[in-house]
A protein has these predicted regions:
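Hydrophobic, well-ordered beta-alpha structural blocks that scaffold small-molecule cofactor pockets
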Residues: 1-45, 50
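C-terminal helix-to-coil terminal segments
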Residues: 1-5, 117-126
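A short acidic, amphipathic alpha-helical/loop segment
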Residues: 27-28, 79-84, 103-106
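A short helix->loop->beta-strand "cap" motif at the edges of active sites that frequently abuts
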Residues: 37, 87-91, 110-112
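Conserved SAM-binding strand-loop segment of SAM-dependent methyltransferases
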Residues: 52-57
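Mid-chain, well-packed structural core segment of small domains
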Residues: 58, 62-98
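Rossmann-fold NAD(P)-binding glycine/threonine-rich loop
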Residues: 96-123
Length: 126
């Protein structure tokens, strides 16, 4: 999955993107944009973030994301993951602090690819 970051045209859906510059949902979004990645913010409380249209959920996207990146608390991430694993999404990435044993067990039971021990900002090179 980390290899898919090398192709900057691959779509990354960022669940928990934020306009709050103090939150990692903002820092990660701006970092990926600055590195030339194709990223869309997912946040039902925002219309736009960093000048990009914000979507309420991943299912609203017209293109299937290559990676769904989570920067939300584990309890929220788990609820969203429960819905997403039943759809045709394969690659899930949980930022440090967004992961949980419950999420990992769910993803393992559905044979989904996931990363829960690395920061996407570190792994996404310029």
């Amino acid at each position: 999955m980390i290899d898919s970051l090398k192709n900057k045209n691959n779509l990354i859906a960022l669940i928990g993107a934020s306009n709050d510059k103090n939150k990692y949902g903002n820092k990660i979004l701006l970092d990926l944009i600055s590195k030339g990645h194709n990223v869309v913010p997912i946040n039902p409380k925002e219309d736009s973030i960093a000048g990009l249209k914000s979507y309420n959920n991943v299912s609203e996207l017209s293109e299937k994301p290559s990676i769904i990146n989570f920067v939300v608390p584990p309890n929220i991430g788990y609820q969203l993951t429960k819905d997403l694993v039943e759809s045709d999404y394969d690659n899930f990435w949980y930022q440090p602090g967004a992961e949980s044993e419950e999420i990992s067990a769910l993803l393992d039971s559905k044979n989904k690819n996931y990363i829960d021990d690395k920061c996407i900002m570190v792994e996404a090179k310029r």
